[in-house]
């Protein structure tokens, strides 16, 4: 059921954010590493992590800083992130930036507690 809902949202969206820069996430076949059968859709669900906010550490990538959602038009939506993402949950970033996806997105109304569904990172040192 969740897979069908996730895929239908992806199919209906022509751009995954106002600028189209996260389209590679939704256009790919990326699936959540934390939620069964949930696509990393991208439509207002994925935010770019600000430069310098993510660091490779022993147990995962430590994030302390803002994530920016490119929703509709400026001013963009900023969300403070303070977490450690285990290496087992990290997927390769196609554009060399750190990206964090969550469901429900900041613009969705839901009883569900927002949680990280996908995290994309460039290779260390790139």
Regions found by a protein language model. Name each.
Residues 1-10:
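Bacterial N-terminal signal peptides
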Residues 14-71:
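N-terminal secretory signal peptides
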Residues 4, 28-29, 90:
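Residues embedded in well-ordered secondary-structure elements
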Residues 9, 34-35, 95, 112:
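Processing junctions and N-termini across compartments
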Residues 63-99:
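Short Fe-S-cluster ligation motifs
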Residues 8, 38-39, 44, 99, ...:
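Secreted/extracellular small peptides and ectodomain modules produced from precursors
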Residues 93-126:
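C-terminal partner/receptor-binding element of secreted or periplasmic proteins
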């Amino acid at each position: 059921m969740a897979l069908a809902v996730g895929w239908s949202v992806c199919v209906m969206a022509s751009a995954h954010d106002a600028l189209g820069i996260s389209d590679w996430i939704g256009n790919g076949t990326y699936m959540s590493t934390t939620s069964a059968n949930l696509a990393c859709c991208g439509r207002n669900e994925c935010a770019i992590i600000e430069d310098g906010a993510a660091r490779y550490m022993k147990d995962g990538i430590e994030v302390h800083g803002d994530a920016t959602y490119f929703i509709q038009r400026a001013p963009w939506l900023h969300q403070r992130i303070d977490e450690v993402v285990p290496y087992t949950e990290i997927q390769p970033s196609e554009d060399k930036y750190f990206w964090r996806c969550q469901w429900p997105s900041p613009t969705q109304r839901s009883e569900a507690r927002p949680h990280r569904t996908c995290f994309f990172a460039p290779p260390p040192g790139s």
